[in-house]
Swiss-Prot record:
The complex is composed of two ATP-binding proteins (LolD) and two transmembrane proteins (LolC and LolE). It is an enzyme of class 7 (translocase). This is Lipoprotein-releasing system ATP-binding protein LolD. Keywords: ATP-binding, Cell inner membrane, Cell membrane, Membrane, Nucleotide-binding, Translocase, Transport. The gene is lolD.
Length: 226
């Protein structure tokens, strides 16, 4: 795998607030290489979620360019952006959003099937990930039969199921108690490092942020290395 992960070049974004434009991002720059985990910190309302949406090709910036696995996304149409996102991106949210009627392994198999992976190969990949997350014995359980920490670990496996080049996570342990959050985060770091993914993780937890390779802070619409 080459070192291309995620690059944000001079990202700008403003929103209408009455008659005025509220500038949330004023030229944010960031580069994350394969195998690197970067913490994104800053107060609520600073623009972290907006930055993640733009990095994940869910929202277009007003200016600047997003490079995903070395591919510039700005000039692409929506169909091409969706294809690029499905091919190279994994997402983890604060709430797991698992399908309640599916078992843990089925939740991890599904995105692979959508991507055209044969079912047998998809199940093999799902069991590999669940095993690395210490969930092999819980693979046939539905989300309602799992603890909060187990549910979030399944969500992490699902995000990495298609071997993305970039992982984006928005407060992935924010809905868990401190002890559970610590354990889930340990598993997340180990799995991401083992996969060689470039990861950007938004968190309000300074202890978790300090365990990542780098910390960048949203400050007045810019990204500042801490």
């Amino acid at each position: 795998m080459n070192n291309h992960g995620l690059k944000l070049d001079n990202i700008r974004r403003a929103f209408k607030q009455g008659k005025d434009d509220l500038e949330v991002l004023k030229g944010a720059n960031l580069e994350i290489r394969a195998g690197e985990i970067v913490a994104l910190v800053g107060p609520s309302g600073a623009g972290k979620s907006t930055l993640l949406h733009i990095a994940g090709l869910l929202e277009r910036p007003d200016g600047g360019e997003v490079f995903l696995a070395g591919n510039p996304a700005g000039a692409l149409g929506e169909k091409e952006r969706t294809q690029l996102r499905r091919l190279h991106l994994g997402f983890v949210y604060q709430y797991h959003h698992l399908l309640p009627e599916f078992s843990a392994i089925e939740n991890v198999v599904l995105p692979q099937m959508i991507a055209g992976v044969p079912q047998a190969k998809a199940r093999e990949r799902a069991m590999e990930l669940l095993g690395r997350m210490k969930l092999a014995e819980r693979a046939e359980h539905r989300p309602g039969q799992l603890s909060g920490g187990e549910q979030q670990r399944v969500a992490i496996c699902r995000a990495l199921a298609n071997a993305p080049r970039v992982l984006l996570a928005d407060e992935p342990t924010g809905n868990l108690d401190p002890h559970t959050a610590d354990g889930v985060f340990d598993e997340l770091i180990r799995l991401v490092k083992g996969s060689g993914v470039a990861a950007l993780i938004a968190t309000h937890n300074p202890d978790l942020a300090a365990r990542m390779d780098r910390v960048v802070k949203m400050s007045e619409g810019l990204l500042v290395e801490v």
